[in-house]
Amino acid sequence: MVRIEYRAHDGRARPAWLLMPEGDIDRPIPLVVSPHDRGESAKENALRWGDLPGEGDFAVIAPAGEGRRLGDYSWGAPGQISDLARMPSVATQHGVDVDPSQVYAVGGSMGGQETLLLVARDPGLLAGAIAFDPATDMARRYRDFRALRDGRWLQRLARVEIGGTPGQVPRAYAERSPDHYVRAIADSGVPLQLFWSTRDRIIRDQRLETGALVRRLRRDHPEARLWVFVGEWRHTAEMRASRRLPRALARFGLLPWADVPQLPRAAGRRA
């Protein structure tokens, strides 16, 4: 795992972590762009991947991100999504021979939110996307922050980053909300895997976020290439090399199924 730097949309130098398979590979390889969730750093997000890049011969780039005003709390800022779309070029500049037909996005929570926004805004970039327990409605997130231990602090950060409350700047919250882009996500043609939990204690009613997004996609766009998995796991717990992440990657051909461990004992269900 190597620390690199890239230039964000606002000109700031930001770190990213690059994971590569070992040894010489004489062909272009797939690249996974992995934005981090709100409660962790880019390095912590990179550590979730374990040895999977080596097992599947693909690279992962995990950028720190950069919002409108804040760094680690980008919450789907338009500039941040533009930066994510540039990650294949960043990886190439740092020696990765990227196969442009095999670029994927994988993220959890805020990273899942940004993964979905990337699908909506730059669909031609991606061969597939995976979102674990994503935030899909930023205005609801702002209101629901109150129920969290550090909720008032998170609301203050959101006002700084987004420019006010949902009542003051509703369009700014909408443009950071995947549920505002249902048609674009469906029309993108990007194969999409969504994972959400009925016992999430961070996004406490995922039925009204990811669940609602799924219902709209299936109702209005039944032809969308969509896999949905529902379980009872802790928030983003399944986005790990030891949990459901390998199965999600194998579904897109990034890992051999023979290398995928058995499902955890408390298996979820397919919706």
Residue ranges and their predicted role:
Residues I185-L192:
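Short, proline-enriched alpha-helix->beta-strand connector loops that line the catalytic pocket
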Residues S101-L148:
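Primarily recognizes the serine-hydrolase "nucleophile elbow" in alpha/beta-hydrolase
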Residues D24-I29, S34-Y73, I202:
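Short substrate-entry loop that stabilizes the transition state in hydrolases
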Residues W75-V96:
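Alpha/beta-hydrolase active-site loop
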